[in-house]
């Protein structure tokens, strides 16, 4: 999970972790984890929190070392990023689905792809469209569009 976060995110988590590791033991307890998660907008009851911590507490100490803490926090950061991306892609799709039918013609998608990469020739575009329009309908629905954009 740590490799899915950028340097700034890891630095922010390190700062939060160090700030709550008052005794400088290199580990924080469950209560502190709960406080940090609340600060991140994530509130859980005691049982759910225990399950989350048990999931990432590799050494079973009941305390989270920094790497374990990052694994836990990354779940929320990555989920938030994925949600934001899905929302942006839905907006982009809606711009091209002017009639609101829930799909865009592959011809419109070709235009979009050409704008994104001017080096694509007709054969490249046909190959890409063939991969995206999995049902061969000549249209691309939101799920196909989402798959193309997120790979």
UniProtKB/Swiss-Prot annotation:
<feature type="binding site">
    <location>
        <position position="61"/>
    </location>
    <ligand>
        <name>Ca(2+) 1</name>
    </ligand>
</feature>
<feature type="binding site">
    <location>
        <position position="63"/>
    </location>
    <ligand>
        <name>Ca(2+) 1</name>
    </ligand>
</feature>
<feature type="domain" description="EF-hand 4">
    <location>
        <begin position="120"/>
        <end position="151"/>
    </location>
</feature>
<keyword id="KW-0677">Repeat</keyword>
<feature type="domain" description="EF-hand 3">
    <location>
        <begin position="84"/>
        <end position="119"/>
    </location>
</feature>
<feature type="modified residue" description="N-acetylmethionine">
    <location>
        <position position="1"/>
    </location>
</feature>
<feature type="binding site">
    <location>
        <position position="133"/>
    </location>
    <ligand>
        <name>Ca(2+) 2</name>
    </ligand>
</feature>
<dbReference type="GO" id="GO:0005509">
    <property type="term" value="F:calcium ion binding"/>
</dbReference>
<dbReference type="InterPro" id="IPR050230">
    <property type="entry name" value="CALM/Myosin/TropC-like"/>
</dbReference>
<dbReference type="InterPro" id="IPR011992">
    <property type="entry name" value="EF-hand-dom_pair"/>
</dbReference>
<comment type="similarity">
    <text>Belongs to the troponin C family.</text>
</comment>
<keyword id="KW-0007">Acetylation</keyword>
<feature type="binding site">
    <location>
        <position position="135"/>
    </location>
    <ligand>
        <name>Ca(2+) 2</name>
    </ligand>
</feature>
<feature type="binding site">
    <location>
        <position position="144"/>
    </location>
    <ligand>
        <name>Ca(2+) 2</name>
    </ligand>
</feature>
<dbReference type="Pfam" id="PF13499">
    <property type="entry name" value="EF-hand_7"/>
</dbReference>
<feature type="domain" description="EF-hand 1">
    <location>
        <begin position="8"/>
        <end position="43"/>
    </location>
</feature>
<feature type="binding site">
    <location>
        <position position="59"/>
    </location>
    <ligand>
        <name>Ca(2+) 1</name>
    </ligand>
</feature>
<keyword id="KW-0106">Calcium</keyword>
<keyword id="KW-0514">Muscle protein</keyword>
<dbReference type="InterPro" id="IPR018247">
    <property type="entry name" value="EF_Hand_1_Ca_BS"/>
</dbReference>
<feature type="binding site">
    <location>
        <position position="57"/>
    </location>
    <ligand>
        <name>Ca(2+) 1</name>
    </ligand>
</feature>
<protein>
    <recommendedName>
        <fullName>Troponin C, isoform 2</fullName>
    </recommendedName>
</protein>
<feature type="binding site">
    <location>
        <position position="139"/>
    </location>
    <ligand>
        <name>Ca(2+) 2</name>
    </ligand>
</feature>
<feature type="binding site">
    <location>
        <position position="137"/>
    </location>
    <ligand>
        <name>Ca(2+) 2</name>
    </ligand>
</feature>
<dbReference type="GO" id="GO:0016460">
    <property type="term" value="C:myosin II complex"/>
</dbReference>
<feature type="domain" description="EF-hand 2">
    <location>
        <begin position="44"/>
        <end position="79"/>
    </location>
</feature>
<dbReference type="InterPro" id="IPR002048">
    <property type="entry name" value="EF_hand_dom"/>
</dbReference>
<comment type="function">
    <text>Troponin is the central regulatory protein of striated muscle contraction. Tn consists of three components: Tn-I which is the inhibitor of actomyosin ATPase, Tn-T which contains the binding site for tropomyosin and Tn-C. The binding of calcium to Tn-C abolishes the inhibitory action of Tn on actin filaments.</text>
</comment>
<feature type="binding site">
    <location>
        <position position="68"/>
    </location>
    <ligand>
        <name>Ca(2+) 1</name>
    </ligand>
</feature>
<keyword id="KW-0479">Metal-binding</keyword>
């Amino acid at each position: 999970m740590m490799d899915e976060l950028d340097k700034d995110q890891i630095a922010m988590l390190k700062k939060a972790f160090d700030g709550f590791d008052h005794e400088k033991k290199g580990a924080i307890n469950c209560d502190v984890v709960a406080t940090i998660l609340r600060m991140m907008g994530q509130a859980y009851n005691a049982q759910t929190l225990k399950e989350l911590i048990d999931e990432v507490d590799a050494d079973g100490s009941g305390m989270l070392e920094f790497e374990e803490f990052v694994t836990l926090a990354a779940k929320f950061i990555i989920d938030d990023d994925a949600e934001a991306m899905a929302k942006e892609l839905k907006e982009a799709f809606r711009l091209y689905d002017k009639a609101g039918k829930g799909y865009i013609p592959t011809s419109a998608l070709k235009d979009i792809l050409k704008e994104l990469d001017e080096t694509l020739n007709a054969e490249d575009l046909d190959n890409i469209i063939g991969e995206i329009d999995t049902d061969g309908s000549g249209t691309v629905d939101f799920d196909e569009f989402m798959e193309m954009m997120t790979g």
